[in-house]
A protein has these predicted regions:
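Sec-dependent signal peptide recognition
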Residues: 2-14, 19
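Boundary at the C-terminal end of the N-terminal hydrophobic targeting segment
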Residues: 20-24
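Ser/Thr/Asn(+Pro)-rich, low-complexity disordered segments
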Residues: 174, 219-235, 251-264, 276, ...
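Catalytic and substrate-binding regions of extracellular carbohydrate-active enzymes
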Residues: 341-574, 642, 654-660, 666-670, ...
Length: 740
């Protein structure tokens, strides 16, 4: 390379004046190509691996590229909703074949024919502009100077897409919003700031002599400043659970945020994966996507608008997270994805797995049996790893970060050999199914103010539940985990949910969730205490619970709608039902054996009235006290998984202050009688004795003041006080308390 040209490239690419918040030296983009995910220095090792231990992965990649060359076409390159995998397969095969000294131009020629004069790259009606940038970087050295400028100019037109600026603007979305980063197809739909696509372009075209060099520099400067100073702290606040759940997370952020951070790392040498706290989004992502897996299917739980998948977009990015963080859990998931055939359509991603990273399963790592993702307020619990028959539970309460989050604070799920406590069945979109954006698909307490007028009320009338923040873009308080501790025998969580309800009707709403973890062969229990204070005694309160199988009610049952609605009233009522192993639908293989049984003992209020409602035509009923909602809120996707066809409505006598106290027993299917439960009350606490004499738990939960109490496990003489603060030292060696 001529000296003057090398000097020019250094001048335009070296961001000498920029310093990331945690970098001691200026950040500079390397001169050579490839820069994105791969470097020239690493090509020889990659080529050697493709000829050795990675031969099977490379054979699949080359077969895809060769098929495309023979067909003379790149599949899906004009499909706006698909990833053009053949484009990347051809570009990567070119790099490896060229490195090995074999003919490789045919792969480049196919891409050049597809790109033509560059119009299809720059077409703002639809273009996978992020993936075109990766391919451009990978075949850069095979292009002549005119082609580099032509296609680089086409790519450069995207640097001001949507915002009108070649910079990160956060226009119409925060760091925690999926469209800020871009979708997994890296196309125009649902791309606002499109940070990932623009970063890939700015890194790819730098130094190519395009008309957009200044814009590329401006965008890189914006990234180098704003990501360390603003984005990383925001991700630390949010934590490892994507704010919009693994539903909208899988559509983009779980895949494309690691793309962006890894492209920056390989192009500059600055590893921003490690810039945040241990509980930040990227360091904790692999843990979250592991904890989401429900044992009886190995698939992600139906939480918020996500669920039913096994990887949620992580298959493509897990190799990048694993190598950037040396993360054994991400590597384990990448190898699982390869074994499950997740790279069949996109074999290029399998070649990014770094074999020097050790893979370890949760059991091999000795992960705890419970985990708090403090930013989102997500608590996961289980009885064992590597056991499809294990018990699994979720409890959540956290702030609203971004638009697509559903309002489900205080919601919980339980499974063992199938779903036991689920959310309202079926799926729906936020735009066409407003009922899905209300409270009655979740397991929480309603406070019915007949004069409340909620947002988004079309076919989603007053449900007595939480304020509806879905599709609001501003961060706001809804609920928070105020106490958490995990021990070998129990996991305890407590949440203040008051901010989630309209202040006109709720003075205080809290929920305490205590999972009593049994030893192998023992039954397990969950204790849930709700302390609810309304502004008026006339505001009726209900404890809502969704179950997948038709429950059997104790006491005298009054049939209101035969086969669908029945009511029983009394003190200490027991309700029971079986698990549903196929609750994830026919496409989800059931890994567990048999079924389990759940008993629910309603101890408070006393007396209580319990309505069982469900079955065909009654699955999605409105609130029982809202006259305009007395119909089945069905929709196009209500029959899809998760299957959860029944709802229990526990009604309390009218009073300003109400306690709901429930003990759930998780037992084998053959068990027909619930274990003994004895309740004693005083002004300070509810006190429980649960189980037989030989396996008796003693539990006390405070009914006023701090959300504390005590627990005594079977065989233990001394009660252990429950915490009134968050304890996460077992996770991080320090406690993670989310910033306000």
């Amino acid at each position: 390379m001529p000296t003057f040209l090398a000097a020019l490239l250094r001048a335009v690419l070296c961001l000498a004046t920029l310093r990331a918040a945690m970098a001691a030296e200026p950040v500079a983009v390397i001169l050579d190509h490839p820069r994105i995910f791969l470097t020239r220095a690493g090509l020889s090792a990659l080529a050697a691996r493709c000829a050795g231990a990675g031969a099977a992965d490379y054979a699949a990649l080359k077969r895809a590229a060769d098929d495309a060359v023979r067909a003379g076409a790149i599949r899906w390159i004009d499909n706006k909703w698909a990833v053009p995998h053949d484009l990347l397969s051809c570009a990567l095969v070119y790099l490896i074949e060229h490195q090995a000294g074999r003919p490789a131009q045919a792969y480049v020629d196919l891409i050049i024919r597809a790109w033509g004069d560059g119009t299809m790259i720059a077409d703002q009606r639809g273009s996978a502009f992020g993936y075109h940038a990766i391919a451009y970087d990978w075949i850069h050295d095979a292009l002549d100077p005119a082609q580099r400028r032509r296609y680089g100019d086409a790519l450069g037109t995207w640097l001001t897409w949507y915002t009108g600026q070649a910079a990160i603007t956060l226009q119409d979305g925060a760091w925690e919003y999926n469209q800020t980063w871009g979708p997994s197809h890296l196309n125009v739909m649902h791309s606002r700031d499109a940070i990932t696509q623009k970063l890939l372009i700015a890194l790819a075209i730098g130094g190519a002599g395009t008309a957009h060099q200044a814009d590329a520099e401006r965008f890189l400067a914006s990234w180098a400043t704003r990501i360390p100073n603003e984005c990383i702290p925001a991700f630390d606040r949010m934590g490892g659970a994507w704010a919009e759940s693994h539903g909208h997370g899988s559509y983009g952020p779980i895949t494309v945020i690691p793309y962006a951070f890894e492209a920056w790392r390989t192009a500059t040498g600055q590893n921003l994966f490690t810039a945040g706290r241990p509980w930040g989004f990227l360091p904790e992502m692999s843990h979250w996507l592991t904890w989401l897996r429900v044992p009886h299917t190995g698939r992600h739980a139906f939480i918020d608008d996500g669920g039913g998948d096994r990887y949620a977009g992580f298959a493509s990015s897990a190799p990048l997270v694993a190598r950037a963080l040396r993360d054994p859990l991400a590597q384990w998931q990448a190898l699982q994805a390869r074994a499950d055939g997740q790279y069949a359509d996109g074999p290029w991603a399998a070649l990014l797995i770094d074999p020097t990273v050790t893979a370890s399963s949760p059991a091999q790592l000795g992960l705890p049996l419970a985990y708090l993702f403090a930013g989102a307020g997500n608590v996961f619990m289980r009885s064992a790893w590597d056991d499809p028959d294990a018990t699994w539970a979720f409890f959540g309460a956290g702030p609203h970060f971004a638009g697509h989050q559903h309002d489900d604070e205080g919601h919980f799920l339980i499974s063992r050999r199938g779903g036991l406590v689920g959310r309202g069945g079926g799926m729906g979109g936020n735009d066409e199914d407003f009922y899905w954006g209300g409270s009655l698909v979740f397991n929480l307490v309603t406070i019915f103010d007949p004069d409340e007028h909620p947002r988004r009320a079309t076919r989603n009338e007053n449900d007595g539940g939480l304020l509806r923040h879905v599709y609001e873009d501003q961060r706001c308080a809804r609920g928070s985990i105020t106490a958490y501790r995990d021990r070998a025998t129990y996991t305890y969580s407590a949440a203040d949910l008051t901010a989630g309800y309209a202040p006109a009707k709720a003075r205080s709403v809290t929920r305490q969730f205590l999972y009593l973890r049994g030893r192998p062969g023992m039954d397990e229990y969950v204790v849930v205490l709700d302390r609810v204070v309304s502004t008026r005694a006339a505001f009726a309160k209900h404890f809502m619970l969704h179950v997948p199988a038709e429950p059997a009610q104790g006491g005298t049952v009054e049939e209101l709608v035969p086969g669908h609605v029945a009511r029983t009233s009394g003190v200490g009522l027991i309700t029971t039902w079986l698990s549903r192993p196929d609750d994830f639908g026919p496409d989800a293989k059931v890994l567990s054996s048999g079924r389990s049984r759940m008993f629910m003992r309603t101890l408070l209020p006393a007396p209580a009235s319990i309505t069982r409602r469900g079955g065909e035509g009654h699955r999605n009923w409105g609130h029982p006290l809202e006259p305009t909602a007395q119909y089945d809120h069905t929709g196009p996707r209500r029959g899809e998984p998760p299957y959860c066809d029944w709802r229990l409505e526990v009604a309390a006598p009218l009073a300003e202050q109400t306690l709901f106290l429930h003990v759930f027993q998780i037992a084998d299917e053959a068990v027909t009688t619930m274990a003994p439960v004895v309740l004693a009350e005083d002004a300070q606490a509810v006190r429980l004795e649960i189980g037989t004499v030989e396996q008796r738990w003693r539990v006390a939960l405070a009914v006023s003041g701090d959300l504390g109490g005590s627990v005594t496990a079977p065989g233990m003489a001394e009660a252990e006080p429950l915490p009134v603060a968050v304890e996460t030292r077992a996770q991080y060696a320090v406690d993670a308390t989310p910033a306000p």
